[in-house]
């Protein structure tokens, strides 16, 4: 076994990477509130795992979406548990994200030289809220339908470009299959991809700059 490890160590310098990960200095003022970002990440990973599991059963059509969610909850093995964990972790992710933003703001973590870390964090906060908006519609029940109708109708108040924006969001003049398809694509592909990209920008900057000092 040691020969296998030595072979990889010679080529990848695993020990140096491990030392870099485990030897970062942690300031004495750090407390549990500095873990909120990590908890948010954990919730996101739970979302990815449970959401991926539900894609095997969910059908993104206006005629079958609600029935497929019912099937997940009543007939699919552990489907009720997977969807419940998905829903609970979604709520937890939003809550932890809000608390994390407040913690960073109140402790001055957005100040020089961490401006870019703050900007990427704000983008991640917007993406998190977008997950909630798009995911809420996917069961295509009465609550989801009317929530989508209200949310997508908000831009209509914008002069000149309002109506085109509404049609872009809905995929047509009214809420229907095109709207559900758009929201499903956003929720399961576009938003997770963008979130992963901005996380890959956010975390290395934290590693590079370290944790901000006390006020």
UniProtKB/Swiss-Prot annotation:
GO MF, one example: oxidoreductase activity
Pfam family, one: Cytochrome_B
GO cellular component: chloroplast thylakoid membrane; membrane
Binding residues for heme b 2: 86, 187
Residues reported in the UniProt entry to bind heme c: 35
Record CDD domains: Cytochrome_b_N
Compartments, as annotated in UniProt: Plastid, Chloroplast thylakoid membrane
Record-level GO BP terms: photosynthesis; respiratory electron transport chain
Required cofactor names: heme b; heme c
InterPro entries documented for this protein: Cyt_b/b6_N (IPR005797), Cyt_B6_PetB (IPR023530), Cytb/b6-like_sf (IPR027387), Cytochrome_b_N_euk/bac (IPR048259), Di-haem_cyt_TM (IPR016174)
Superkingdom as given in the UniProt entry: Eukaryota
PROSITE patterns linked to this entry: CYTB_NTER
Transmembrane segments: 32-52, 90-110, 116-136, 186-206
Mode of membrane association: Multi-pass membrane protein
UniProt-listed Gene3D superfamilies: Cytochrome Bc1 Complex, Chain C
Cofactor note: Binds 2 heme b groups non-covalently with two histidine residues as axial ligands. Binds one heme group covalently by a single cysteine link with no axial amino acid ligand. This heme was named heme ci.
Complex and partners: The 4 large subunits of the cytochrome b6-f complex are cytochrome b6, subunit IV (17 kDa polypeptide, PetD), cytochrome f and the Rieske protein, while the 4 small subunits are PetG, PetL, PetM and PetN. The complex functions as a dimer.
Family statement: Belongs to the cytochrome b family. PetB subfamily.
Other known facts: Heme 1 (or BH or b566) is high-potential and absorbs at about 566 nm, and heme 2 (or BL or b562) is low-potential and absorbs at about 562 nm.
Function: Component of the cytochrome b6-f complex, which mediates electron transfer between photosystem II (PSII) and photosystem I (PSI), cyclic electron flow around PSI, and state transitions.
UniProt name for this protein: Cytochrome b6
């Amino acid at each position: 076994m040691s020969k296998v490890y030595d072979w990889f160590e010679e080529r990848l310098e695993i020990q140096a990477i491990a030392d870099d990960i485990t030897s970062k200095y942690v300031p004495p003022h750090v407390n549990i509130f500095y873990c909120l970002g990590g908890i948010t990440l954990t919730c996101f990973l739970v979302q990815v795992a449970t959401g991926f599991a539900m894609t095997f059963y969910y059908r993104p059509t206006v005629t079958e979406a609600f029935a497929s969610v019912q099937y997940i909850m009543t007939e699919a093995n552990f489907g009720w548990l997977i969807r419940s964990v998905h829903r609970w972790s979604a709520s937890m992710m939003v809550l932890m994200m809000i608390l994390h933003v407040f913690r960073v703001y109140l402790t001055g973590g957005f100040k020089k030289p961490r401006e870019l870390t703050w900007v990427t964090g704000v983008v991640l906060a917007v993406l998190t809220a977008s997950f909630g908006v798009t995911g809420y519609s996917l069961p295509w029940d009465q609550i989801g339908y009317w929530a989508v109708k209200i949310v997508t109708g908000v831009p209509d108040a914008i002069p000149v470009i309002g109506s085109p924006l509404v049609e872009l969001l809905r995929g047509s003049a009214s809420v229907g299959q095109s709207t559900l398809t758009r929201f499903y694509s956003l929720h399961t592909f576009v938003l997770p991809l963008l979130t992963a990209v901005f996380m890959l920008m956010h975390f290395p900057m934290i590693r590079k700059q370290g944790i901000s000092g006390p006020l």
